[in-house]
Amino acid sequence: MKAFKGFSPELTSLLGDHKEETSRFVPGATMYAKESKTARTGYHCCENPFECLAYYAWDGKNRFWEVEARGDIDEDSQERISCTEIRLVKELTPFEFAYEGMLYMLNHPQRGNWQQAFKGCTVAKDEAEAREADDIAIARGENPKVKGGYNSILGLIKEKDGEILDAKIIRIVVPKMAGRWMTINENREVIMLEEEAD
């Protein structure tokens, strides 16, 4: 099962039993646990990558990986996963992390808990804003709008009555786009919105 996991800069898990053999990870290697029970035993990960931010801050130091969860898998109502086998598949860039989070919402539009508010990452109804480089802001709604600073990552998900109609993710690399509200049209083209006068 495809899932996501956060780590310290040294690829260690900050939660769990803190033993070297169960807390330090190696890319490509499979780790094994005897049993899995969410919030108790096994290796933990999340199906929604943004849920990892509840445990590891979006600070430019922590690392986020796509993982493969296998073996005995236990899930809880908070979308956490515990498994007896886990393998690090790919380290995600900030853009890939945001993309995977949007993809999760597109694949599971009816699931709750999609709104997120962490330092550096906001996923919100109707409008969201990112301030710094590599910060993430994703807006979801009938007429979503986003705004971000230079080199921030912005996502737009248009929906109506719970059905996803369109989506787009961009990185702000054109200076004139920084700090301006934007949305997408029916052709998924980015449209700058007029700023309201003070």
Where are these regions (language model features)?
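Short, glycine-biased loop/turn motifs at secondary-structure junctions and
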Residues: 1-198
